[in-house]
Amino acid sequence: MKRMHECLDHMDEGIGRVSEIFPDLPVQEVVLTRLLLLVGGTLLGELESKLKPYGLNDSDFRTLMMIYSSPTGSATPTELCEYAQQGATNMTRIANVLVKGGLITRATSAEDRRRVVLSITTAGKRLVRKILPPLFPNVHGAFASLSAADKRTLDRLLRQIAVNIDTLTQPDAGP
């Protein structure tokens, strides 16, 4: 990939040309959207490259982390679909990968035999403890030029955008 500043210049020039053709183009919002996608895509690519040696991708790891971080060390596929923003078919694939890797178990719920519960294994916990610390330097580095106040502001703004998008895509979802 070209250096990021070259990508940003190219993006700005392209959006400028499109805005000449479409005068009503919401330029600032388009720029912000492209920036979010560019930054998110870059972060995702870096994460995926770190996870690949472990046979995991972002959605696998995110799911494993959700189970790892739950108070009980377990979750239902339905809960995971909702919070990991995955469809049922992909969640089945993810669960199969994690079960096959010995990172989680799949069992029937003791409270409701119709429900399946996915629980993290000792091997899953061990893998999380192995994978996470080497990710910290890149996470710190991505935000190194931001002050603590900048980070709080960015957090607040991104959360507002997330709620706005949720409202647009699911009109019955209010704040």
Language-model features and meaning:
Residues 1-24, 149-175:
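C-terminal regulatory/oligomerization modules of transcriptional regulators
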Residues 1-54:
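N-terminal leader segment of winged-helix/HTH proteins
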Residues 27, 37, 41-87, 169-175:
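N-terminal helix-turn-helix DNA-binding core of bacterial DNA-binding proteins
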Residues 31, 35, 62-66, 126, ...:
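Pre-recognition alpha-helix immediately N-terminal to the DNA-recognition helix
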Residues 58, 72-117:
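Canonical helix-turn-helix DNA-binding module
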Residues 65, 93, 156:
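DNA-binding alpha-helical recognition surfaces that contact promoter or target DNA
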Residues 96-156:
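Charged, amphipathic alpha-helical coiled-coil/dimerization segments
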